[in-house]
UniProtKB/Swiss-Prot annotation:
Modified residues (Phosphotyrosine): Y127
Subunit structure comment from the entry: Homohexamer formed of two homotrimers in a head to head fashion.
Domain of life: Eukaryota
Protein name: 6-pyruvoyl tetrahydrobiopterin synthase
PTM per Swiss-Prot/TrEMBL: Phosphorylation of Ser-18 is required for maximal enzyme activity.
Gene: Pts
UniProt entry tagged with the keyword Zinc: yes
Entry keyword annotation includes Phosphoprotein: yes
Reaction(s) catalysed by this chain's protein: 7,8-dihydroneopterin 3'-triphosphate = 6-pyruvoyl-5,6,7,8-tetrahydropterin + triphosphate + H(+)
Amino acid sequence: MNAAVGLRRRARLSRLVSFSASHRLHSPSLSAEENLKVFGKCNNPNGHGHNYKVVVTIHGEIDPVTGMVMNLTDLKEYMEEAIMKPLDHKNLDLDVPYFADVVSTTENVAVYIWENLQRLLPVGALYKVKVYETDNNIVVYKGE
């Protein structure tokens, strides 16, 4: 007899995408001197760029028919719409309206991605967004 019959198994599914974007860390609430002190070289008036990596993790029940939490093709399309189209090869501060009034820190990039994905994914599916600004600078956001 199959021990899994009748069990409702749950799993987490993650997918990685990479995008390139530029930005400048600058808060209009701070003076030029304060911005330079807080953000250092990242406050360069001409901005700077990153090759971001984003890992999106969803969770849910494993469908007993398909064996999947979600079809990876669907997740890929959601991530294309929520991450790649609005952010890839963009100046975050100039090309993405969200960042007109929000400092484009990696924390806020993670929040932006979370909010975009929440609008597309089934309710309750999104578990976490992990954004690598560099290999050493990483933000994890779980909607909290």
